[in-house]
Amino acid sequence: MAFFSVKQQDKEAALLTVLRNVIKLPMETGVRFERDEENPKKRKRVSKDVAGAATEHQTIVFVSTKHHVEYISNVLIKAGYQVSYIYGSLDQVARKTQIDRFRQGYTNLLVVTDVAARGIDIPVLENVINYDFVDNSKVFIHRVGRTARAGKKGWAFSFVSPEELPYLVDLQLFLNRKMIVGSSTEQELDYTSDVVIGALPMSQLELDNEWTKIHVLDDTNLEALRGVSLNGYKLYCKSRPSAAVESYKRAKEIVDMDEYAEIHPLFSKDKHSLEAMG
């Protein structure tokens, strides 16, 4: 598990940074099939062996609302990624098509809400990204439990804004784990048990923020989707339950710490790097 301290307005850029620099998600999946757009029944299907070989980067991205699914999936497609998406009101035919493309490796990103993800079984899943952090610790367990199955390795990456930090404190207490803030610690890190939070490199975040601003403002559809998602997020925040009172106090203390602004250990060049963790 890895937790990144991110401002809410920087989350699009944070997602691009993590996909490129941490997960190293390829733009191409390596799986192709010929389509007959007029007759879907005539589509040539790839063999199971080839499709299975393309799932090593399979990543699911959890967002808070249907509007975020539409917006974020379009941002990722604009960035050149192969993306599937699911939300609650998607019709069953489209839903099945999106899931099948992800399962078979035609896409390697699946953007979903918690409600839409219920009942979906993804046998091979390498990464889970919590774009919007959970307001319920049990939901977090359910999300991250989708990866690292059957003895395989997997990662769960979470973006945590200052407003969401109290929920991370709730999670830490629920899991009974220690929290490590920043990268200056001398402690040996265990990403399977420790709650390690740190910032993303500003240089990389700025580049992806600039890309996002240029491409969203240059695309009227994306700009409209972004506006709708922002309004949806405001309603989501009003309806979500509050964290524990003590968690708000502890979260404020964490934000005030000097270590809170430090780069996450995954981005350092020492023994704590992602490569060293395998």
Annotate each predicted stretch with a short phrase.
Residues 1-4, 54-59, 84, 92, ...:
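Short interface patches used for recognition in eukaryotic signaling and trafficking proteins
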Residues 74-173:
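Conserved RecA-like helicase motor core of SF1/SF2 enzymes
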